[in-house]
Amino acid sequence: LKEISASIKEEFNVDCNYIAADLADSSAPEMIYNFCSENNYIVEVLVNNAGYSINKKFHETGEDEEEKFLRVLGIAVVALTKKFIPSMLEQKHGKIMMVSSLASFAPPSSGWGSLYGPIKTFVNRFGDAININYRSQGITATNVCPGFTVTEFHTASGMQDAMDKVPAFMKKDSKTVAIGAVQAMLKGKSVWVPGALNKLLAFLCNILPTSIVIKMSSSLAGGRYE
């Protein structure tokens, strides 16, 4: 974080600060909020982007692993949004990015990652709720739903072998996705799915029977869902 902060300062000639926090810790959202308040930061944009995946079958995971996972990908999203919404209401302006996934539209993968897709579906619905309740007051939430994106996510989650099976035409670079996501958020879009193929897949997931979607996903992902 220190290196990235210094790089941003140098490249863009702006002030950039940071705080290290473990969102698996229930006190982290409060700590982040207090850090911003103590530094008199007026938060106009909130990006809920923390995430990872558990590379185990559901029966192999411990309850503590699942609780931490759900806290980072779900509870912390709600808690941080809850903390910063009041000041956005005072400003009558605010942008919130919910970094979700194309997996939020599809059935969970067979045996693996049984919680990832479902929690991302929750994030989408939560983003929808923010829009329904606060768009008229100047606050918008954008559900960003990327497909396979080249980042350190899969390596960190012990899933790089699975990622390597995915055809190159289905992968997008992280910079392209990040730029598109920010543009969509600033425009106040409710949902943004990068790329024509991913948009088609999201559409098909909503209209095709679940059994067909599972087979289609497995085929396109090089057996990742088998």
Residues of each region from the PLM?
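Substrate-binding pocket helix/loop in short-chain dehydrogenase/reductase
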Residues: K57-H59, E65-F69
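Residue(s) in the substrate-gating loop at a strand-loop-helix junction
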Residues: S101
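C-terminal helical subdomain
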Residues: N143, D164-L201
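Active-site helix of classical SDR
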Residues: T81, I119
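Rossmann-fold cofactor-recognition segment
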Residues: E10-S26
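Conserved NAD(P)H cofactor-binding loop of Rossmann-fold oxidoreductase domains
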Residues: N49-I54
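Active-site-adjacent segment of SDR/Rossmann-fold oxidoreductases
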Residues: E11, A106, D128-T140
